[in-house]
Amino acid sequence: MARYTGPVCRLCRRETMKLFLKGDRCYTDKCALERRNYAPGQHGQGRTKVSDYGTQLREKQRMKRTYGLLEKQFRAYFDKADSMKGVTGENLLVLLERRLDSAVYRLGFASSRTEGRALVRQGHFLVNGRKVNIPSYVMRPNDVIELREKSRKITRINDALDGVMRRGLPSWVELDREAFKGTFKTLPVREEMTTPAFQEQLIVELYSK
């Protein structure tokens, strides 16, 4: 299955929840979901009864689309989460937040995870002083992400940083705006991962069938 390249606002409408795929636009009344809070297409406003399986499948699609993963990649993360100690659904969310592209987004270097992935691949970041261009690189507590010197005048990065300074950062990361440097302080806990509001247990139930 190829990666989706169409209008990302349609994905939020399809899932009937904000997936925060469009940067600052998602926080304004220009958000497509604010204007049309129903699925796209001719029958988008129609009411249909959704089965338990359908509800579970939708939740999986929401999480996959939020983190920009294909089914094979997502299933690999789930299998790893399932093999770990603790609650599988919570483990899954933590693994996804530990991706470098997610950390770049959470720190505000990118306005969306998709943009974060592109910036990582283009080699704009150092992790603990070493260039890393793999979006799935696994972050560890106290890892330091630094924007390379030659990238610090890029307008879209500075705009994204200004945006996150207004909105605030999640508790598991820390940003030094002036130094273009951020720290992945600790592993996030479930209570802190509130946006988007996933029901990860539905995904566990789906894959456990």
UniProtKB/Swiss-Prot annotation:
Any one GO molecular-function label of the UniProt entry: structural constituent of ribosome
Domain of life: Bacteria
Gene3D superfamilies: Ribosomal Protein S4 Delta 41, Chain A, domain 1 (1.10.1050.10), RNA-binding S4 domain (3.10.290.10)
A single BP term in Gene Ontology: translation
Residue span, S4 RNA-binding domain: 98-159
Function: One of the primary rRNA binding proteins, it binds directly to 16S rRNA where it nucleates assembly of the body of the 30S subunit. With S5 and S12 plays an important role in translational accuracy.
PANTHER family: 30S 40S RIBOSOMAL PROTEIN, SMALL RIBOSOMAL SUBUNIT PROTEIN US4M
Subunit structure: Part of the 30S ribosomal subunit. Contacts protein S5. The interaction surface between S4 and S5 is involved in control of translational fidelity.
Protein name as catalogued: Small ribosomal subunit protein uS4
Species assigned in the record: Syntrophotalea carbinolica (strain DSM 2380 / NBRC 103641 / GraBd1)
Gene: rpsD
